[in-house]
Amino acid sequence: LSFGSAEQCHKILPGIAQGELVFCIGMSEPDSGSDLASLRSPAKRSDDGWLLNGAKIWTTNAHEADYMFGLFRTSTVPDNRRGGLSQFLIDMKTPGITVNPIVDLPGREHFNEVVFEDVQLSHNCLIGTEGEGWDQVTAELAYERSGPERYLSSIQILLALVDELAARPN
């Protein structure tokens, strides 16, 4: 909502509101660990828009997603690894995208590697401003990681603490 174009919002918001669309977030890359600024997967300008290559790893529910919010390197900015990153709205049915499940110890497949091989996106798939992806994703992650789902995930611990304190005489 904050960074998407009016066209992008009109395209996806009705499906989000109706619970019909599933999204995944493609940021982490193989061999990068937790260093998001080290991502290398390129998005190169083409006559028709953007050409994506590379891979994302630990992408939750990519195998079920309709779309990905993907972070790619659109340019190299000397002395600023956070510069030159851009976000894209990616239809997961686009040719050239392969989703490989990562099986966890109990045998579940929640996480995935997503491989991009000459994936062609139109110009209007760029979210926000080219090269401003770092600021966009940090703003989005700050919201995501401080919203109701964050503190509500601790509700059982808080309720147990209230019960424990209520049971004490003083």
Predicted regions and their residues:
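N-terminal glycine-rich flavin-associated loop
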Residues: 1-7, 33-36
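A generic, well-ordered mixed alpha/beta core segment in the N-terminal half of proteins
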Residues: 4-17
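A short, Trp-centered hydrophobic/proline-enriched beta-strand micro-motif
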Residues: 19-27, 71
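Short glycine/proline-enriched turns and hinge-like loops at secondary-structure junctions
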Residues: 35-37, 48, 61-66, 80-84, ...
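A structural signal for short hydrophobic beta-strand segments in well-ordered beta-sheet cores
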Residues: 41-44
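A short core secondary-structure module
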Residues: 53-100
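Glycine-rich beta->alpha junctions and the first turn(s) of the following alpha-helix
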Residues: 97-170
